[in-house]
């Protein structure tokens, strides 16, 4: 094990000098430095650059407070390694695989794997054409998720990405019954804490591993924590041949941390100040999140859209890797429609008659056509009013508004805020409900009866209470 000495510390960047005869550590190797003589407080550094003349530049995974020039640094000879396997279930980790819950820490001999790996080769991959039912009407009807697929939840600040991902955990993890891995990347610690206790109460935690590198962590930890969660998921897929659910909240923070690290390493910034290696870093992460012939990884990733600008390089780079996109729209939150999923901007590779069936496909495309026509007519309505529309257009607008409201529903995880119980709607019920609205079966019911309900039967009950 070769050793060097700290030459300089600039925030989370630490330069380490190795003696001229010593072997330099490889890129991505983990180095250890002890802050105190008792060797109780250690900091892990990851090699990022070799500067020449025995000097390497590293990124710290923890705060560098207390580090001084001249402290001894040890090369572990391998990348950061984290615990994997059944022992990880029900536990909460940081980027280094250290437990941060109140339970006993792991034994030294627990099975560990490095966080840096190659993506599976082309001949190992497998694809699926089976739909993953979420119980959320707008998703199941218009942008269905594939088992073993990759899903992105796009949205600006405060439009409901985390609530939607928590509802998906509630619905899918409980129904799925398999193994889930939740990775919190640069998000609020409070949300992670709430999620942990909710999962503990519901019992889902027994089949879930949680990894957190939150907003208060150094950029190195936020950049690598997604790889830690992914390594745990990969083990279940490859070694235990499981079907794994991988939740990541938020992929944008991974890019943001990469941008901070890139600037600290002295690289020239690229478009909008992002790192020049943005596409490479995103590709290396996303290509590992895939399904192989041994098992599947279904990943659901929240992706923050800065200033609601979808052309920003961070969300635009993530788009290319996804099977389904669920776009959250601020205008819908202003109308009180939750989840605020844009039915026309969201898309899915799975929405084809071969995968979802002829009836589902026909209903979904007709719903999109009606909503698109309503959007085109809104300018006329705003300027001239409803009276200028033909009878056929008036009927279409009425149905479009009912569809728009019926695409909303109450969430189980939001019950504490709304006071209303959440609903899980099977796909068959969703398709039947929208088909009947399109046929004009409920044209006589008030539009408000369609707002925030579950299946179509709830609309009828709500209308009866309103006196219709």
Swiss-Prot record:
GO cellular component: plasma membrane; proton-transporting ATP synthase complex
Listed CDD domains: ATP-synt_F1_beta_C, ATP-synt_F1_beta_N, F1-ATPase_beta_CD
EC annotation from Swiss-Prot or TrEMBL: 7.1.2.2
InterPro entries: AAA+_ATPase, ATP-synt_VA_C, ATP_synth_F1_bsu, ATPase_a/bsu_AS, ATPase_alpha/beta_chains, ATPase_F1/V1/A1_a/bsu_N, ATPase_F1/V1/A1_a/bsu_N_sf, ATPase_F1/V1/A1_a/bsu_nucl-bd
Membrane topology summary: Peripheral membrane protein
Catalytic activity: ATP + H2O + 4 H(+)(in) = ADP + phosphate + 5 H(+)(out)
Disulfide bridge map: none
Recorded GO MF terms: ATP binding; ATP hydrolysis activity; proton-transporting ATP synthase activity, rotational mechanism
Compartments, record wording: Cell membrane
Subunit (UniProt): F-type ATPases have 2 components, CF(1) - the catalytic core - and CF(0) - the membrane proton channel. CF(1) has five subunits: alpha(3), beta(3), gamma(1), delta(1), epsilon(1). CF(0) has three main subunits: a(1), b(2) and c(9-12). The alpha and beta chains form an alternating ring which encloses part of the gamma chain. CF(1) is attached to CF(0) by a central stalk formed by the gamma and epsilon chains, while a peripheral stalk is formed by the delta and b chains.
Family as reported in the entry's similarity comment: Belongs to the ATPase alpha/beta chains family.
Protein name: ATP synthase subunit beta
Origin species: Streptococcus pyogenes serotype M49 (strain NZ131)
């Amino acid at each position: 094990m070769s050793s060097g000495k700290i030459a300089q510390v600039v925030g989370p960047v630490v330069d380490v000098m190795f003696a001229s005869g010593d072997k330099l550590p490889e890129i991505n190797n983990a180095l250890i430095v002890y802050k105190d003589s008792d060797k109780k407080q250690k900091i892990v550094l990851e090699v990022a650059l070799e500067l020449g003349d025995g000097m390497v530049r590293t990124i710290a995974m923890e705060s560098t407070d207390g580090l001084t020039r001249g402290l001894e640094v040890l090369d572990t000879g391998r990348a950061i390694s984290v615990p994997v396997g059944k022992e990880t279930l029900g536990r909460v980790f940081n980027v280094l695989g250290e437990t941060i819950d109140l339970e006993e820490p792991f034994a030294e001999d627990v099975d560990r794997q490095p966080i840096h790996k190659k993506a599976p080769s082309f001949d190992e991959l497998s694809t699926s054409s089976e739909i993953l039912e979420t119980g959320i009407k707008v998703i199941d009807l218009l942008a269905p998720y594939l088992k073993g697929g990759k899903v992105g939840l796009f949205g600006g600040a405060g439009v409901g990405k985390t609530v939607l991902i928590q509802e998906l955990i509630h619905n899918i993890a409980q129904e799925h019954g398999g193994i889930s891995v939740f990775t919190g990347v640069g998000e609020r610690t409070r949300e992670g804490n709430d999620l942990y206790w909710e999962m503990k109460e519901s019992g889902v935690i027994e089949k879930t591993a949680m990894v957190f590198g939150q907003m208060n962590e150094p950029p190195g930890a936020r950049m690598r924590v997604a790889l830690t969660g992914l390594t745990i998921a990969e083990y279940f897929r490859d070694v235990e041949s499981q079907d794994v659910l991988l939740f990541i909240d938020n992929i944008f923070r991974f890019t943001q941390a990469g941008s901070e690290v890139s600037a600290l390493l002295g690289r020239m910034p690229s478009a909008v100040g992002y790192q020049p290696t943005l596409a490479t870093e995103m590709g290396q992460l996303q290509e590992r999140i895939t399904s192989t012939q041994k098992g599947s990884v279904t990943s659901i990733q929240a992706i923050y859209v800065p200033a609601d600008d979808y052309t920003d390089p961070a969300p635009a780079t993530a788009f290319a890797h996804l099977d389904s996109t669920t776009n959250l729209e601020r205008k819908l939150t202003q109308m009180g429609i939750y989840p605020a999923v844009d039915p026309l901007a969201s898309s899915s590779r799975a929405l084809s008659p071969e995968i979802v069936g002829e009836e589902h496909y026909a209903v979904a495309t007709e719903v999109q056509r009606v909503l698109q026509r309503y959007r085109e007519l809104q300018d006329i309505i705003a300027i001239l009013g409803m009276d200028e529309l033909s009878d056929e257009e008036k009927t279409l607008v009425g149905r479009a508004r009912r569809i728009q409201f019926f695409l909303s529903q109450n969430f189980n995880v939001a019950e504490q805020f709304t006071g209303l119980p959440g609903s899980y709607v099977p796909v068959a019920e969703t398709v039947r409900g929208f088909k009947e609205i399109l046929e004009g079966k409920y044209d006589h019911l008030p539009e408000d009866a369609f707002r925030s309900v579950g299946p179509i039967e709830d609309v009828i009950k709500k209308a009866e209470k309103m006196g219709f």
